[in-house]
């Protein structure tokens, strides 16, 4: 599995601000979107382009356009919604697919409860977004769902990832690509990433 920890100074600075225990919901939400936008830039660096001719102000001009597969953004409810706008800033024409998977706080197992995928999902590249890759259960369940629906081109964008989650994802889906702002130390006994961001969903939605 391709694993990319993006060490760009802008990303690391913004992520550092997000780790502040006293950060406001508004600021956390803004930074989540900003980091997501920067991760998208990295994750789409290998998209193929083609040369087309358009009519410019002084006559015909050749420009580069993205070619090939169309893109769908796949936020995992609910925290993934906090990353969606950051991706769409760079790819405004992307279709949105929504998957609902929550983690049972006692068993730490994923529980799927909702899906609404973009049309022709089998023809699209999926950018799956979720702030935290902790145990990997929710992400694996989402990718299972996408693959069962015919999607074969999948990239994962997360703000922070735990080694345990990376290992589980790689074992389940070695063909996907993972882009993260940070590979953190470990999971604690409650399944939270250390140092992590706390509960990203609560911080994005203001439901502490």
Curated annotation (Swiss-Prot):
Keywords: Allosteric enzyme, Glycosyltransferase, GTP-binding, Magnesium, Nucleotide-binding, Transferase. Gene3D superfamilies: 3.40.50.2020. One of its GO terms (biological process) is uracil salvage. Its cofactor is Mg(2+). Its EC number is 2.4.2.9. GO terms for molecular function: GTP binding; magnesium ion binding; uracil phosphoribosyltransferase activity. It catalyses: UMP + diphosphate = 5-phospho-alpha-D-ribose 1-diphosphate + uracil. Uracil binds at residues 193, 198-200. InterPro entries: PRibTrfase_dom, PRTase-like, Upp_B, UPRTase/APRTase, Ura_phspho_trans. Pathway: Pyrimidine metabolism; UMP biosynthesis via salvage pathway; UMP from uracil: step 1/1. Binds 1 Mg(2+) ion per subunit. The magnesium is bound as Mg-PRPP. PANTHER family: ADENINE PHOSPHORIBOSYLTRANSFERASE, URACIL PHOSPHORIBOSYLTRANSFERASE, CHLOROPLASTIC. Catalyzes the conversion of uracil and 5-phospho-alpha-D-ribose 1-diphosphate (PRPP) to UMP and diphosphate. This is Uracil phosphoribosyltransferase. It comes from Proteus mirabilis (strain HI4320).
């Amino acid at each position: 599995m391709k694993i990319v920890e993006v060490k760009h100074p802008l990303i690391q600075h913004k992520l550092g601000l997000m780790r502040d225990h006293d950060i406001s919901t508004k600021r956390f939400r803004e930074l989540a979107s900003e980091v997501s936008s920067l991760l998208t830039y990295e994750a789409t660096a290998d998209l193929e382009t083609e040369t087309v001719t358009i009519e410019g102000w002084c006559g015909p001009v050749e420009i580069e356009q993205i070619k090939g597969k169309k893109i769908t953004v796949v936020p995992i409810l609910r925290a993934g919604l906090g990353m969606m706008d950051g991706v769409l800033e760079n790819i405004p024409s992307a279709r949105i697919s929504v998957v609902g998977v929550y983690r049972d706080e006692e068993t730490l197992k994923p529980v799927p409860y909702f899906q609404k995928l973009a049309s022709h999902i089998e023809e699209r590249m999926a950018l799956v977004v979720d702030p935290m890759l902790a145990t990997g259960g929710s992400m694996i369940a989402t990718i299972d769902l996408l693959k069962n629906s015919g999607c074969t081109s999948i990239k994962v964008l997360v703000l922070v990832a735990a080694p345990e989650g990376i290992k589980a994802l790689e074992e389940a889906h070695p063909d996907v690509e993972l882009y993260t702002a940070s590979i953190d130390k470990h999971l604690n006994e409650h399944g939270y990433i250390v140092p992590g961001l706390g509960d990203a969903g609560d911080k994005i939605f203001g439901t502490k």
